[in-house]
Amino acid sequence: MRVVLITLFLFIGAAVAEDAGIDAITPEEGKANNIIEAYESPRFQKFVTHCSSHVTQTCSGNDPLNNQEASRMNSPFGLSFCLFDSMEKCLADHKASLKDPQDNNNLASMSSLPGSIQNQPLLIETVKFRAVLKTCSHVSARYCFTNPNVATSALADCLMPSLTHCVYPSSSILLPPPPPPPPLI
């Protein structure tokens, strides 16, 4: 069973790497040029655009139905998880789920892969989207927590443009680099 899983993950990794091509930006180049990796699939972009306001409201602590999320927002790490989890939930609510509704532990196409190769493009698209969404969540959380004014009211104002910039980098305003860390005394 382990061999099958390892082979499956190697296959997925090879397919994603092959699809990315030679012109992919390395993480070092992206950090040096202040470039955030973008996901250009219209299939998921429309849902991300719709879900971003809900996600920022939930994760900034302004959602009265989700007060338990406020305790997780003490660090960029907790905020990053909230952004990713809330986006996944919102996508599932809009039938753009990244998970199989019958199996909450696997990706949508993962369970059908061994029997059929016809789902490979959807699987590659889903794996790419999840990877970019995790990166966007992490970058947005880190950027918004390093902002000088990190009050709860300002957090939602920071998260919305940051998530939008991650999905639509060419049409949104470029984010300035985060401020330098305070000097050590």
Swiss-Prot record:
Protein induction: During nodulation in legume roots after Rhizobium infection.
Keyword terms, alphabetized: Membrane, Nodulation, Signal
Subcellular locations according to the entry: Symbiosome, Peribacteroid membrane; Symbiosome, Peribacteroid space
One GO term (biological process): nodulation
Residues spanning the signal sequence: 1-17
InterPro entries referenced in this protein's UniProt entry, alphabetically: Nodulin (IPR003387)
Domain of life: Eukaryota
GO CC annotations, alphabetized: peribacteroid fluid; peribacteroid membrane
Family: Belongs to the nodulin 20 family.
Protein name as it appears in the record: Nodulin-20
Natural source organism: Glycine max
Higher taxonomy: Eukaryota, Viridiplantae, Streptophyta, Embryophyta, Tracheophyta
